[in-house]
Amino acid sequence: MSPRLIFATGNQHKLEELRRALPGMDIRALGRDDPPPEDGATFEDNARIKARFARAHADVDVWAVGEDSGIEAAALDGRPGVHTARWAAGDPVGRMLAALDGVTDRAARYVCVIVAVGPEGEEVVARGTLAGSIALSAAGDEGFGFDPVFVPEGESATVAVLGDAWKRTHSHRARAARALAEALPT
């Protein structure tokens, strides 16, 4: 039997993406309006903060899950990184395109870290990355965030063009979710 997961997120897109990546697991949102501050120095730090927060507010028999993710652009020295959500507020695509205007090195990667804290305080850390580059202009209607400008390695279209079916299998979050599923006890 798969463990039940309580996911500390208010982001419906992330919740649905995790559910699609782990179809056999019972995944529910924590359902709180007072998230902890994301003041960690790394994606793992922030994911752990959220997982521990969820653990403190969840039923005793579930795994509490926190996730942090973002995009790192090589030409921006890895920024926005852990500050992706704040950096991208409003118009993430426009801000990224403006930041890389005239820049030839458009290498970037999506990063996702998921931390799960079990009923006894045991911890599982799962990571997923998706390397690629930032396109010169936006294309596509599916996805969210930077998907309209992110072209994965080996592909010629943005994630927003490739679509949800592609993303369900190949995204940084899907990769981290699979690593989590492999690491959790059954």
Regions found by a protein language model. Give the residues of each.
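Anionic-ligand binding patches
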Residues: 2-6, 12-186
